[in-house]
Design a protein with these regions (language model features):
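Glycine-rich flexible loops
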Residues: 1-110
Length: 110
């Protein structure tokens, strides 16, 4: 995400469902310092906050877990703070659905 200019610093995080586990990026790590050894693993069905890994999971782990728990069709959750989306949100402006697939599933604005 950072390489594409979609995210900066340590903001944003990613989770991935693997069987009954959720693999999730740790809190406070800049993306260029992230490696597979630092990824936290949690049971997608337990809300106790227990994890395996050297670093604690993202502070937004509950947000990721709840989406993965309620939506079995979802495999990955990406949470980021895109410069352009953040700017438009701050200005209270809509993001137009410029691709027909977005309009087909969500309407004319995001």
């Amino acid at each position: 995400m950072a390489r594409l200019g979609l995210n900066h610093g340590s903001t944003g995080n990613l989770s991935y469902r693997h069987d009954d586990s959720m693999l999730i990026t740790p809190s406070g790590i800049e993306s260029h310092k992230l490696s597979s050894e630092l990824i936290a693993s949690m049971n997608v069905n337990d809300s106790n906050g227990e994890f395996d890994g050297p670093l604690p999971p993202s502070s937004e782990w509950r947000f990721h877990q709840e989406i993965l728990r309620k939506r079995e069709d979802v495999t990955c959750v990406v949470h980021m703070h895109s410069t352009y989306a953040t700017t438009l949100a701050t200005l209270h402006r809509d993001i137009p659905a410029v691709h027909y697939m977005i309009a087909a599933f969500g309407g004319p604005i995001i």
